[in-house]
Amino acid sequence: MGIKILEKCVGCGNCVVFCPRRAIKTYGVAIVDENKCSNCGICARYCPINAIKVDTSL
């Protein structure tokens, strides 16, 4: 369960801006802090290249 950043991430920073928990940083590509992430999926909605996948399986 969680957010997965795919290899095609270009580090645009949209996910960082829109994450309500401030759980994402960019260091060339996006990195998710799983301790802060609530798995809401807002970051994925704002990714212009669909490089973020939300795993909702239990």
From Swiss-Prot:
Protein name (record): Uncharacterized ferredoxin MJ0624
Chain sites annotated for binding [4Fe-4S] cluster 2: C19, C37, C40, C43
Its biological purpose: Ferredoxins are iron-sulfur proteins that transfer electrons probably in the CO-dehydrogenase complex.
Keywords: 4Fe-4S, Electron transport, Iron, Iron-sulfur, Metal-binding, Repeat, Transport
Organism: Methanocaldococcus jannaschii (strain ATCC 43067 / DSM 2661 / JAL-1 / JCM 10045 / NBRC 100440) (Methanococcus jannaschii)
Boundaries of every 4Fe-4S ferredoxin-type domain copy: 2-27, 28-57
Domain of life: Archaea
Record flagged with keyword Iron: yes
SUPFAM superfamilies per record: 4Fe-4S ferredoxins
InterPro entries, sorted: 4Fe4S_Fe-S-bd (IPR017896), 4Fe4S_Fe_S_CS (IPR017900), Fe-S_Ferredoxin (IPR050572)
Gene3D superfamilies: 3.30.70.20
GO molecular function (one): metal ion binding
Cofactor binding annotation: Binds 2 [4Fe-4S] clusters.
UniProt: [4Fe-4S] cluster 1 binding residues: C9, C12, C15, C47
Listed PANTHER family: ADENYLYLSULFATE REDUCTASE, BETA SUBUNIT, FERREDOXIN III
Cofactor: [4Fe-4S] cluster
